[in-house]
């Protein structure tokens, strides 16, 4: 079925409606097909377009050509010898969990190693049961007490901050005898980042352990513990992107004298097998990205398929969430191009039109859009239809109202920023964040991910989003703050809207350093709220982890600047060892 418009820009637009329906469906009235999603292809023959001054961000070309991605190879596969060996190793490691039943410290160390090696998802039920039952003696040392505290909070269990009181003197300060206990101090430091508001002892623990670890570093001999201390002081364990931590910790664990060879082999094999899943997903995504046509049609936007996949992998790395990662990557790829359209390329009147058209959610709205926006508009509708259809088919859950609302809210937030820029308006810090936590796309990404985590009904999904709002909000705010710290200078140079740092500088009349310190303070504040919400939250740990992991991924991507816009360097290196290079 074809619909032909006569465009106001003297172009002819052909829209072909493609029904994704069972083979036996026959042509008939459109109402007969209302239960199936509509997919659209676009062919535009434009005679001319209105000449407008267009800005450019001058993004470098992709360093990951989609055709090269399709050539990724690995000898690892779940079939045959590797799959059989994986199962055998899982059985061996599972038996280890029962070996230490009378040694709580041994159990806790094993669980911690499993988590940091990236294999704990195989033993989730066993780990939860152990953590629910394990109790420490009153004379347990600093290392074990802090490790126990951290693991319980990470898994959503309630544990009091008072467990650290025994390590303080009568004057309330941590004992001098702890100052040489480097493993205990590192464990205390890691635990302190699971603190909540009002837990002053954990703030004191953070200050004390930080000071002592820095002092010990000055006298260290460069061993493996020293390396871990440097790593912790650079990025706290609780803030690290999981998959990068897994790769790094495998290298650390194999150098430890007390490592378990079966667990080490499992970690390496599992890492390589999961990497093979990532490569399969990326090959599918590379074909989709080429077919989408953004690379040829939208020269102003970032071509960053691999880097966008890093976001998805960071949010949810386990192999059985493959479909979630694929849809998240598609979402982020389209979002990035739409973001560039609002930030850089589109004129304000065009952006007003696009936002209005998206509210209508109707392919007929294409007639009023300039040619370059048509492909963006249809990409959103096609993607949403594909996702909604898949979730409806697999889960029986109808998500279109939620998905549509997220896209509309996102573009409305983009439009607010475009209006600010075009009018020369500088918002206050609070006014900026009120809009920017939405425009960063975190809320929208989590809603898309949640649609693929499995729900029993539309009401269940709605309640999920309602009761998880605080987690979604604070994790999205953290993404925005990390983004601004890493990208604000580059975005200001290319003429983008002011970011939180500039808003605070102008509003308060302070230096850039003071503004950045304020943002860093807000990041610490937000993490404390997240810690509390992740324990209070009665929703699935998969949902909680997606929220936390999105924040961790943002910290990773923007740690050294704009890891997406300028992805040559650290981002490239990380993608190579996460996706391309197996562990030998």
Curated annotation (Swiss-Prot):
Is the keyword Lyase in the record? yes
What's an example of a GO molecular-function annotation for this chain? terpene synthase activity
Q: Where does Mg(2+) 2 bind?
A: 339, 343
**Does the record's keyword annotation contain Magnesium?**
yes
- From which residue to which does the signal peptide run? none
Q: Name one GO biological process term.
A: diterpenoid biosynthetic process
Which cofactor does this sequence's record say it needs? Mg(2+)
Residues that hold Mg(2+) 1 according to the record:
339, 343
Q: Which domain of life is it from?
A: Eukaryota
UniProt xrefs under Pfam families = Terpene_synth, Terpene_synth_C
Give UniProt keywords alphabetically.
Answer: Lyase, Magnesium, Metal-binding
Annotated Mg(2+) 3 binding sites: 491
Q: What is its EC number?
A: 4.2.3.-
**Where does motif DDXXD motif map?**
339-343
Q: How is the cofactor bound?
A: Binds 3 Mg(2+) ions per subunit.
Instruction: Write out the similarity annotation.
Output: Belongs to the terpene synthase family.
Q: What does this protein do?
A: Probable sesquiterpene synthase.
* Additional information: Does not produce any detectable product when tested in vitro.
Question: What domain notes does the record hold?
Answer: The Asp-Asp-Xaa-Xaa-Asp/Glu (DDXXD/E) motif is important for the catalytic activity, presumably through binding to Mg(2+).
State the protein's name: Probable terpene synthase 9
Q: Name its species.
A: Ricinus communis
Q: Source organism lineage?
A: Eukaryota, Viridiplantae, Streptophyta, Embryophyta, Tracheophyta
Tell me the name of the encoding gene: TPS9
């Amino acid at each position: 079925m074809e619909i032909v418009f006569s465009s106001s820009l003297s172009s002819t637009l052909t829209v072909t409606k493609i029904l994704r329906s069972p083979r036996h469906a026959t042509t008939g009235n459109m109402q007969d097909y209302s239960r199936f999603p509509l997919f659209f292809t676009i062919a535009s023959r434009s005679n001319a377009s209105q000449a407008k001054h267009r800005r450019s961000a001058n993004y470098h070309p992709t360093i990951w050509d989609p055709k090269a991605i399709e050539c990724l190879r690995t000898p690892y596969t779940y079939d045959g010898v590797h799959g059989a060996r994986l199962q055998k190793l899982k059985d061996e490691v599972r038996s280890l969990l029962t070996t230490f039943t009378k040694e709580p410290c041994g159990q806790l160390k094993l669980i911690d190693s499993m988590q940091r090696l990236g294999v704990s998802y195989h033993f989730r039920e066993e780990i939860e049961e152990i953590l629910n039952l394990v109790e420490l003696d009153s004379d347990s040392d600093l290392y074990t007490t802090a490790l126990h505290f951290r693991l319980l909070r990470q898994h959503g269990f309630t544990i009091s901050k008072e467990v650290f009181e025994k390590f303080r003197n009568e004057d309330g300060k941590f004992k001098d005898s702890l100052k040489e206990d480097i493993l205990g101090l590192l464990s205390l430091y890691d635990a302190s980042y699971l603190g909540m508001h009002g837990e002053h002892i954990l703030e004191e623990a953070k200050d004390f352990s930080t000071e002592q670890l820095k002092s010990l570093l000055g006298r260290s001999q460069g061993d493996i513990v020293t390396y871990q201390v440097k790593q912790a002081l650079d990025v706290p364990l609780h803030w690290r992107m999981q998959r990068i931590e897994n790769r790094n910790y495998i290298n650390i664990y194999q150098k430890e004298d007390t490592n378990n060879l079966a667990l080490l082999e499992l970690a390496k094999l599992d890492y390589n097998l999961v990497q093979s899943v990532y490569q399969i997903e990326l090959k599918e995504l590379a074909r989709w990205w080429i077919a989408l046509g953004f690379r040829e049609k939208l020269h102003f936007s970032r071509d960053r398929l691999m880097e966008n996949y890093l976001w998805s992998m960071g949010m949810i790395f386990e192999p059985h969430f493959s479909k979630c990662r694929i849809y998240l990557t598609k979402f982020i790829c389209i979002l990035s191009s739409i973001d560039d359209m609002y930030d850089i390329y589109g004129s304000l009147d065009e952006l007003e039109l696009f936002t209005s058209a998206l509210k209508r959610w109707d392919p007929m709205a294409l007639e009023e859009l300039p040619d370059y926006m048509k492909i963006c508009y249809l990409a959103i509708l096609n993607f949403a239809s594909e996702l909604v259809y898949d979730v409806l088919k697999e889960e029986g859950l109808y998500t279109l109202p939620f998905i549509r609302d997220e896209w509309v809210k996102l573009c409305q937030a983009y439009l607010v920023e475009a209006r600010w820029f075009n009018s020369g308006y500088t918002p206050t810090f609070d006014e900026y964040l009120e809009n920017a936590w939405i425009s960063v796309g975190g809320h929208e990404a989590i809603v898309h991910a949640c649609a693929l985590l499995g729900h029993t009904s539309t009401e269940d999904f709605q309640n999920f989003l309602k009761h998880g709002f605080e987690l979604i909000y604070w994790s999205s705010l953290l993404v925005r703050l990390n983004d601004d710290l890493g990208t604000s200078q580059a975005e200001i140079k290319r003429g983008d809207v002011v970011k939180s740092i500039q808003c605070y500088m102008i509003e308060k009349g302070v230096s850039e350093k003071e503004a950045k310190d304020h943002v860093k303070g807000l990041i610490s504040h937000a993490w404390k709220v997240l810690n509390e919400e992740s324990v209070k939250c009665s929703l699935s740990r998969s949902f909680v982890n997606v929220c936390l992991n999105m924040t961790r991924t943002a910290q990773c991507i923007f740690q050294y600047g704009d890891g997406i816009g300028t992805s040559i360097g650290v981002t490239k290196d990380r993608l190579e060892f996460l996706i391309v290079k197996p562990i030998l």
